[in-house]
Amino acid sequence: MVPPIIYKYKRRKDRRLGRDDDSSVMMTRRRPDSDFIEVSDENRSFALFKEDDEKNRDLGLVDDGSTNLVLQCHDDGCSLEKDNSNSLDDLFSGFVYKGVRRRKRDDFGSITTSNLVSPQIADDDDDSVSDSHIERQECSEFHVEVRRVSPYFQGSTVSQQSKEGCDSDSVCSKEGCSKVQAKVPRVSPYFQASTISQCDSDIVSSSQSGRNYRKGSSKRQVKVRRVSPYFQESTVSEQPNQAPKGLRNYFKVVKVSRYFHADGIQVNESQKEKSRNVRKTPIVSPVLSLSQKTDDVYLRKTPDNTWVPPRSPCNLLQEDHWHDPWRVLVICMLLNKTSGAQTRGVISDLFGLCTDAKTATEVKEEEIENLIKPLGLQKKRTKMIQRLSLEYLQESWTHVTQLHGVGKYAADAYAIFCNGNWDRVKPNDHMLNYYWDYLRIRYKL
């Protein structure tokens, strides 16, 4: 049995109801540019019929399916008549092709449904469809969904390819339309420079309804390595089960002085030798040997020695007190670990209090300490000065190196300013070297 053609019916707001019985039908004129006939009944349902060799067409179910109408076409016109036959074949033949259920509102605000879709109406041109208020819906049309993108992902571009499995497609079946949709995983905003294809990492979900399409989904997603925001330009793809080892296990960054223009030096720990703590040896003043201490250069000044050291541009403190060897030794003792400017402000007051070695032994220690306190080490230096003064007053010493607190610096100063043996010594102090160079130039040595 060939199923009859099922037509789609739609209510028209510009038609009036027939006031006879339920089978009363109003006939409309045939459009001159179309071969279709528009028919409506009192329930404001209508359809288009196309004439062919068979003049009779079964309308199937009209509106709620209460009656079956048969189109009778003759030479003088066509009319609809009610078919009272209770044939089950004719009744169920209307359900052979089931379409999408559409809901519409009538003039009174009630919702009515229409379940019939005619495939022949889809072939008509756009003008005939708009004039006859026929709506067409195809379940197999493709619905491309726009992916919701966070404002943080505006810089990233996701290519949506129209290959199989990538496009969003809706498939029709008897139970309705179900969507097979390709999802794109969420990407961190730190990967704005990278472009991710939609088909490379996707989540394919299939279900019977549009709302529950996420149920039963299978994920096929590529792992993405998390990268610090400071490395936005570089994108490192991490393969599964191939995680790169940390570089800190192999290299160590060493802090380098700013005077080295290189950004940094990486030292391999396997080749790095353990640094030994080198003990810094303090700077020790040169010490005279026993033979040097007993040299004739450091002999005690005799009364017949008439050496007068000349004045120099260096303006040393010893140049002003060369006439008293005790003062020269005291000045050298105070200049140890002290600048000449500090000592110059104290030395005049000290020699005012202690004019010679004998007076220094008679002055109380507290008075000397108060004078040399700005230089530091006042207690130690006070005891050294008084002990030096006691030994200096004795007649038993023959060399200046035998006195307490006299080192190479004081012995060289004694030989240069007191004895005049400057050409036989080589001082280590920088100020004495200036004066020694001056004497060499003066006497052309």
UniProtKB/Swiss-Prot annotation:
It is found in: Nucleus. Isoform 1 and isoform 4: Expressed in leaves and flowers, but not in roots or stems. Gene3D superfamilies: Hypothetical protein, domain 2 (1.10.340.30). Its EC number is 3.2.2.-. Keywords: DNA damage, DNA repair, Hydrolase, Nucleus. GO terms for cellular component: nucleus. One of its GO terms (biological process) is DNA repair. GO terms for molecular function: DNA binding; hydrolase activity. The active site is at 429. It comes from the Eukaryota. The keyword Transmembrane does not apply. Its main location: nucleus. The N-terminal domain (1-290) does not play any direct role in catalysis and is not required for product binding. Monofunctional DNA glycosylase targeting U:G and T:G mispairs. Excises uracil derivatives and exhibits a preference for a CpG sequence context, irrespective of the methylation status of the complementary strand. The activity follows a biphasic kinetics, with an initial burst of product accumulation followed by a slower phase. Specifically binds its reaction product. Triggers the base excision repair (BER) pathway. This is Methyl-CpG-binding domain protein 4-like protein. It comes from Arabidopsis thaliana (Mouse-ear cress).
